[in-house]
Amino acid sequence: MTGTDLPSIYRSYIACLNARDWPGLGRFVHTEARYNGRRIGLSGYREMLEKDCDEIPDLHFDIRLLIAEPPHIASRLQFDCSPKGVFLGLPVNGRRISFSENVFYEFLDERIANVWSVIDKAAIEAQLMNDSKGAAPEQAKRFP
């Protein structure tokens, strides 16, 4: 796999997520996929994403940084969304929040086999704290 192939595959994967093309997910995710060290397989991966989109109807994956060193991808994804209810243990309850996810992927046979994800929960906590104090949402953002 060349360095030019991997970014293209990854961008197509993100387009698949944003289109909610769950039947097409198998083109990008390995049947034995692992997420943060736990084997969830393609079906578990799909269930996780479907649940995320159900809980966050306006979820959109925005690539802000993409680095490829085959067979790995490192990406910083940006989100600006309104989760229903509790998100990451926080009572968001439909408020609009912005946060990033730093995520690393390992590809096998041109499909995602391993994912390591870290979400900036502190950014969400700061926004919720500022919102509860009456600050404008723009003041609560920690990053552009």
Where in this protein do the model-derived segments appear?
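C-terminal and inter-domain tail/linker signature
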Residues: 1-144
